[in-house]
């Protein structure tokens, strides 16, 4: 817990008012016992990977996850290719539409990997440019997703 407090304090020190008090834990995983501690240490949001069970895992904390990871971790640990990444995105959107997952949770796309390649970057740029004009698509900023002002 001390590292979480230090991390948020350091972000505030460096980024000031631009800091969004949302924890994205290493490897997008967190021990359930830590979750109730987060609001007391200044965190207003949590983002992990996969479908959330609830939007409020503890009082004072909003959880909004990512659902599409374009990196193939099981095989070559690199960009899985546009086809497979789009299949994952479409699968999540289908699950939302069919009510298999929380339809109120925005679809999250992981883009923070240290092993990012030009091919992955080009995919993200193309995805953004081709979807941003579609009437059913709205790209959101983290502060808007978590209802925080920056």
Please place each PLM-identified region on the residue numbering.
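Short, surface-exposed connector motifs at secondary-structure boundaries
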Residues: 13-21
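Active-site-adjacent pocket scaffolds in enzyme catalytic domains
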Residues: 21-103
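The substrate-binding groove and active-site-proximal loops of carbohydrate-active enzymes
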Residues: 1, 21, 77-80, 112-117
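Well-ordered, non-membrane alpha-helical segments in soluble/globular domains
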Residues: 4-5, 82-94, 121-130
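C-terminal domain-boundary segment and adjacent tail
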Residues: 45-46, 50, 101-150
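Divalent metal-coordination and catalytic microenvironments
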Residues: 7, 23, 109
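An active-site-proximal "capping" alpha-helix that borders the catalytic cofactor pocket
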Residues: 1-11
